[in-house]
């Protein structure tokens, strides 16, 4: 009976589906099952200034596609990022508040997913390529260090002192997808399209300029990349504020510091102005008040969408080439409304001054730097303590393919290793090399 039921279901499916070369019919509706046809179909539904598909030669290595590949190129990039080890490790990397201190603190992974959701929503509203925006968003923080920005600043300082370049997480993210990750025996990296790689690099400024092929000095050439760059800032500021409120850290800090309390009150006033909440004034100290963050995010997302439409109309943007020409002049088209931008900048300045200066965060940052410093100095003084695969890289840093643009490559191997650690692994590795009583 089970076999008969299976056969019946298969016959029903065959009646619904009709395969014909590059097309499949589902109840009479024809859909492409060929990558080229799928990407060509985007031209009918996306705006003329969107990135329809990658340019020729966008991947460094030629990809071998199945004849009936049913994903577009940017969807493939998205999937490669999701299945990478670096992406999985984001789950155990601190955003601002160390995640093992509370079950609901955001991590690099949750932040990344939130940025991807914002980016897809705005891209859909503007008829941009959602797949490209999502791929950029999912890859934008792959190069982040454990324990948040404190370790990034430490590694940057070490390289700068040694005159060996700089360390910025956006550049490291490109380095992860270009060299550190591996999906083929024939080459290093994930072999992503240049459109995705450029967006990852430019979600923050490329201050070192080591990826010259991606035009580091200009804003992102795609509107999809510009969307990710802006919503990344919106996401982390709003959600870091929310985590601070829900944890009770902000309320406790207000009770101890008058200046801090004044700054938080100013943030509250600005948010009330942004939300135009004349009838009901919200505060930012109690858990019950955190739901206003959703309203704030909605307000900012709508501001971005509406102002970006106005920018596109005002600048008479009709093609992707128009977007690129403005980018070459240093101008972006994805922006907040001017009055909202001014208020948001003030909120950002106050959050950096007050929330990120909370004693608990500063204590966690100090401990993180101590761990990173001990690891760095230990590996510099005795590279043989590196794991075998990292030691192999250390001994073969004359490979120009992997270290192009970097000076004194051995130090960069150590930076790569530390930057790739999760919070948990960094603590375990620190214990392994610093505690004489631990078993090896």
PLM ranges: what are they?
Residues 1-5:
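Ser/Thr-rich, low-complexity intrinsically disordered segments
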Residues 134-139, 230-231:
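Short alpha-helix carrying the canonical HExxH Zn2+-binding catalytic motif
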């Amino acid at each position: 009976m089970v076999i008969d039921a299976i056969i019946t279901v298969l016959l029903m499916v065959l009646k619904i589906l009709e395969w014909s070369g590059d097309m499949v019919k589902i109840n009479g509706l024809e859909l492409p099952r060929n990558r080229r046809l799928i990407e060509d179909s985007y031209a009918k539904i996306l705006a003329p200034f969107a990135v329809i598909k990658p340019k020729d030669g966008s991947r460094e290595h030629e990809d071998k596609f199945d004849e009936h590949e049913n994903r577009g190129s940017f969807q493939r990039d998205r999937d490669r990022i999701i299945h990478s080890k670096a992406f999985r490790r984001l789950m155990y990397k601190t955003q601002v508040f160390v995640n093992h201190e509370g079950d609901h603190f955001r991590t690099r992974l949750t932040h990344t997913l939130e940025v991807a959701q914002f980016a897809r929503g705005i891209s859909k509203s503007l008829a941009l390529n959602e797949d490209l925006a999502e791929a950029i968003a999912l890859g934008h923080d792959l190069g982040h260090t454990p324990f948040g920005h404190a370790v990034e600043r430490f590694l940057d300082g070490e390289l700068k002192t040694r005159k060996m370049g700089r360390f910025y997480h956006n550049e490291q993210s490109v380095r992860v997808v270009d060299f550190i990750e591996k999906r083929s025996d024939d080459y290093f990296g994930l072999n992503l399209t240049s459109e995705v790689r450029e967006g990852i690099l430019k979600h923050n400024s490329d201050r070192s300029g080591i990826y010259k092929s991606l035009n580091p000095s200009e804003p992102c050439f795609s509107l999809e990349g510009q969307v990710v760059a802006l919503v990344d800032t919106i996401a982390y500021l709003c959600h870091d504020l929310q985590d601070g409120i829900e944890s009770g850290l902000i309320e406790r800090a207000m009770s101890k510091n008058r200046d801090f309390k004044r700054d938080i009150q100013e943030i509250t006033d600005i948010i009330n102005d942004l939300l135009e909440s004349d009838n009901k004034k919200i505060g930012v100290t109690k858990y019950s008040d955190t739901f206003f963050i959703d309203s704030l995010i909605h307000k900012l997302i709508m501001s971005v969408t509406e102002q970006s439409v106005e920018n596109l109309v005002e600048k008479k943007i009709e093609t992707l080439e128009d977007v690129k020409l403005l980018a070459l002049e240093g101008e972006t088209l994805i922006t907040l409304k001017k009055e909202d931008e001014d208020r948001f900048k003030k909120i950002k300045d106050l959050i950096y001054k007050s929330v990120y200066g909370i004693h608990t965060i500063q204590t966690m940052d100090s401990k993180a730097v101590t761990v990173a410093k001990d690891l760095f100095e230990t590996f510099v003084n005795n590279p043989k303590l590196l794991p075998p695969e990292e030691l192999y890289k250390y001994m073969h840093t004359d490979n120009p393919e992997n270290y192009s643009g970097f000076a004194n490559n051995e130090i960069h191997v150590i930076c790569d290793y530390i930057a790739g650690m999760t919070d948990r692994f960094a603590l375990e590795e620190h214990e392994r090399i610093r505690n004489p009583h631990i078993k090896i």
